[in-house]
Amino acid sequence: MSVLAEQYKEEIVPKLMDKFDYENIMAVPRVEKVVVNVGMGELKEDPKLIDVVVNDIASITGQKPVITRAKKSVANFKIREGMPIGAKVTLRGETMYEFLYKLVNVTLPRIRDFRGVSPKSFDGRGNYNIGIREHIVFPEIEIDKVDKVYGLEITIVTSAETDEEAYELLKLMGMPFNQ
C-alpha cells in the first residue's frame, strides 16, 4: 500500500470525522480518481507528436493514455471529426495514490516561482483542477530529449459533497494551497 493511502486510512479519516461530524466512516470524503489530460491543437500539423505525448504521459502516470479525438468538424479550428487532438489517462486505486504523492511532494515544488496552488479551483461539487504549463516539471521527463513543451490538466475527483470538505481532504493529503 502506498504511503498516501496508509496516511489517508490512519490519520486523515479520523481528522475529517472529527471536523465534519460524520457518523459513518463511509461518509468521509475520499479521492475517487485522478484524470490527467493533454489537449494539443498542434497535433493537426504534426501527427508524429501524438506518439511523443502518449509516451510522455505514460511515463508520468505509469499507465497508457487514451488518444482523444475530435467529436465534430470545426472549420475555424481546422479540425475534422475523428482527428487526434489530445490524450488522457484516468488513474484509480494504488497508481492514483502514488501519482498524487509524487505530484504533491516532487512535481509541484519543481515549478518555477511556485507559491502554492489556488484554493479557488474547486468546481462546486468537491472536485479540484490543476493546470500545469510545462510538462517538464515531472521528474520522469528528460529535458534533453524534449522537442516541444506542452501543458496538461490534472483533475482530482473526490466523493466530497462540498468544496470545503474536498479542500480539507486535499490539505490533509499535503496539497500546498496558497493563502
Swiss-Prot record:
It comes from Halothermothrix orenii (strain H 168 / OCM 544 / DSM 9562). The keyword Lipid biosynthesis does not apply. This is one of the proteins that bind and probably mediate the attachment of the 5S RNA into the large ribosomal subunit, where it forms part of the central protuberance. In the 70S ribosome it contacts protein S13 of the 30S subunit (bridge B1b), connecting the 2 subunits; this bridge is implicated in subunit movement. Contacts the P site tRNA; the 5S rRNA and some of its associated proteins might help stabilize positioning of ribosome-bound tRNAs. GO terms for cellular component: ribonucleoprotein complex; ribosome. This is Large ribosomal subunit protein uL5. Keywords: Ribonucleoprotein, Ribosomal protein, RNA-binding, rRNA-binding, tRNA-binding. The keyword Hydrolase does not apply. Belongs to the universal ribosomal protein uL5 family. Transmembrane segments: none annotated. HAMAP family: Ribosomal_uL5_B. The gene is rplE. Part of the 50S ribosomal subunit; part of the 5S rRNA/L5/L18/L25 subcomplex. Contacts the 5S rRNA and the P site tRNA. Forms a bridge to the 30S subunit in the 70S ribosome. One of its GO terms (molecular function) is rRNA binding. GO terms for biological process: translation. InterPro entries: Ribosomal_uL5, Ribosomal_uL5_bac-type, Ribosomal_uL5_C, Ribosomal_uL5_CS, Ribosomal_uL5_dom_sf, Ribosomal_uL5_N. Disulfide bonds: none annotated.
